[in-house]
Curated annotation (Swiss-Prot):
Family to which this protein belongs: Belongs to the somatotropin/prolactin family.
Cysteine pairings via disulfide bonds: C81-C199, C216-C224
UniProt-listed Gene3D superfamilies: 1.20.1250.10
Keyword Disulfide bond set for record: yes
PANTHER family per record: GROWTH HORMONE D5-RELATED (PTHR11417:SF31), SOMATOTROPIN,PROLACTIN (PTHR11417)
Name of the protein in its database record: Prolactin-3D1
Domain of life of the source: Eukaryota
Subcellular location as annotated: Secreted
GO cellular component: extracellular space
PROSITE patterns: SOMATOTROPIN_1 (PS00266), SOMATOTROPIN_2 (PS00338)
Keyword vocabulary terms for this entry: Disulfide bond, Glycoprotein, Hormone, Secreted, Signal
Organism name: Mus musculus
């Protein structure tokens, strides 16, 4: 998978360094020793996801503080996140009962499903009057990190499959919120931005929780 990152300045450099470091998890030469052990991938992903959740929570919190207004949420029902159709365990017991491969596949589906909406969230926050520069930069950081997270999850998943099909398809839902996000109606636009901030925070937290369980299961044989 080729990553394309369109960032500039210090934030862009930090992200490029992050990607350069984390992409070492896959073989960079023909030598088997160049492949980072799966156990290390889990550790790196766990740290990356934890930090990404902090960023997502910051973006949500800042948007909520600066833009939340009863005028654009009154008489509106919070919609389901576009990833709601992806079957994921809902509690700790279900997580522990789910096979490693199935949990990884669900996490990959969630990550893939955010590639497109994150692009538009970055654009929306960057262009939003009154939004801080840091909020847009954090959203761009989340967007780049999601690509790295996806790369890592796919690497681990591929290694876990003895007879994996080439170019295996993943069943992820399409995002259909662009019209609302680009609406000329300010209330509709802000409500759409709010829901993206809310849902990315929710989904990153979910994947973060799952990777911790899998790391405990795979690396420490559930002794943690």
């Amino acid at each position: 998978m080729q990553l394309t990152l369109n960032l500039s300045g210090s934030a862009g450099m930090q992200l490029l360094l992050l990607v350069s470091s984390l992409l070492l998890w896959e073989n960079v030469s023909s030598k088997p020793t160049a492949m980072v052990p799966t156990e290390d991938l889990y550790t790196r992903l766990a740290e990356l996801l934890h930090n990404t959740f902090i960023l997502a929570a910051d973006v949500y919190r800042e948007f909520d503080l600066d833009f939340f207004d009863k005028t654009w949420i009154t008489d509106r029902t919070l919609p389901l996140c576009h990833t709601a159709s992806i079957h994921t365990p809902e509690n700790r017991e279900e997580v522990h009962e789910t096979k490693t491969e199935d949990l990884l596949k669900a996490m990959i589906n969630v990550s893939i499903s955010w590639k497109e909406p994150l692009k538009h969230l970055v654009s929306a926050l960057t262009a939003l009057p009154g939004a801080s520069e840091s909020m847009g930069k954090k959203a761009a950081d989340i967007k780049g990190r999601n690509l790295v997270i996806l790369e890592g999850l796919q690497t681990i998943y591929n290694r876990s499959q003895a007879n994996i099909e080439e170019n295996e398809n993943f069943d992820y839902p399409a995002w259909s919120g662009l019209e609302e996000l680009q609406s000329p109606n300010e209330d509709t636009h802000l409500f759409a931005v709010y829901n993206l901030c809310r849902c990315i925070k929710r989904d990153i937290h979910k994947i973060d929780s799952y990777i911790k369980v899998l790391r405990c299961r795979v690396v420490f044989q559930n002794e943690c």
